[in-house]
């Protein structure tokens, strides 16, 4: 009897834990298995483990501990990149079918970058960076990011920048 009750609860948990924003899940489903595409998903437990054991200062550690999931999709193949525009392809799906609001838009020549987010008065719960044009990428961050923590991190690390892979 316990198994009959446990199985539906387990499936419900799995389906809700895998849920992501419209546009994000579509992009990953379409591109993650294609050659020339880098797809990275980092779960919260791995991020918190890195925060605990990494050689980080207090602000870096606190920032990492506030992140529950990171998903990155980048098109690196030149031919596929020339035929694709992630911004054009998924902008409408995110804008129309999501709770996310546009936080910032940058257009420079052929490149388009839009940052979407879901926030309350205390934190940013979800952040989506959508890049299309000459370069195509999508970065999705879910967690409880405090704006003052991001600001402090950027002030203390101006050479690195936020969400930068520079050393």
Please give the residue ranges for each predicted region.
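Positively charged n-region of N-terminal signal peptides that target proteins for export
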Residues: 1-4
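C-terminal motif of bacterial Sec signal peptides marking the signal peptidase cleavage site
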Residues: 14-17
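Early exported N-terminus immediately downstream of N-terminal targeting peptides
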Residues: 24-90
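Extracytoplasmic
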Residues: 37, 65-69, 98-100, 108-110, ...
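Short Gly/Thr-rich strand-loop-strand
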Residues: 93-119, 163-167
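A short, solvent-exposed beta-edge/loop patch
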Residues: 116-147
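C-terminal partner/receptor-binding element of secreted or periplasmic proteins
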Residues: 135, 141-167
